[in-house]
């Protein structure tokens, strides 16, 4: 099992905008080889931002990497540059492999 998480710092007061973007977007993940599960998680709120993480589970690192090179990935991220004003910076990718 392989887990990929992108952490997003969202400008305070723009949380609903961010959640709407994710609720309404097509992730193009269904049917992708090795894809298991996706969740959008909300974390702590700080003075000037709220923390979110997109959380996807894959059969293996190889499946995740293959997806990042696919047309499905390009389609899922085609509007990534829009709404830049709601982010405090670029997302931070963190990846994990199951050990136990």
Where are these regions (language model features)?
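Glycine-rich beta-strand-turn "strand-cap" elements at beta-sheet edges
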Residues: 2, 39-48, 78-100
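Short, well-ordered beta-strand segments in beta-rich or mixed alpha/beta enzyme
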Residues: 3-8, 39-70
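Short, surface-exposed ligand-recognition loops at beta-strand->loop->(often short) alpha-helix junctions
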Residues: 10-18
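Short amphipathic alpha-helical coupling segments at ligand-binding clamshell hinges
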Residues: 17-21, 67
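Short amphipathic alpha-helical/adjacent loop interface patches that line ligand
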Residues: 22, 26
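An amphipathic, aromatic/His-enriched active-site/gating alpha helix that lines ligand/cofactor pockets
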Residues: 27-36, 57-92
């Amino acid at each position: 099992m392989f887990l990929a998480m992108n952490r997003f710092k969202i400008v305070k007061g723009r949380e609903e905008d961010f959640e709407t973007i994710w609720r309404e977007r097509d992730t193009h993940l269904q049917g992708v080889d090795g894809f298991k599960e996706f969740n959008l998680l909300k974390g702590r709120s700080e003075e000037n931002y709220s923390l979110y993480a997109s959380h996807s589970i894959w059969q293996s690192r190889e499946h995740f990497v293959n997806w990042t090179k696919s047309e499905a990935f390009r389609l899922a991220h085609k509007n990534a540059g829009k709404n830049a004003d709601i982010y405090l910076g670029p997302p931070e990718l963190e990846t994990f492999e199951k050990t136990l």
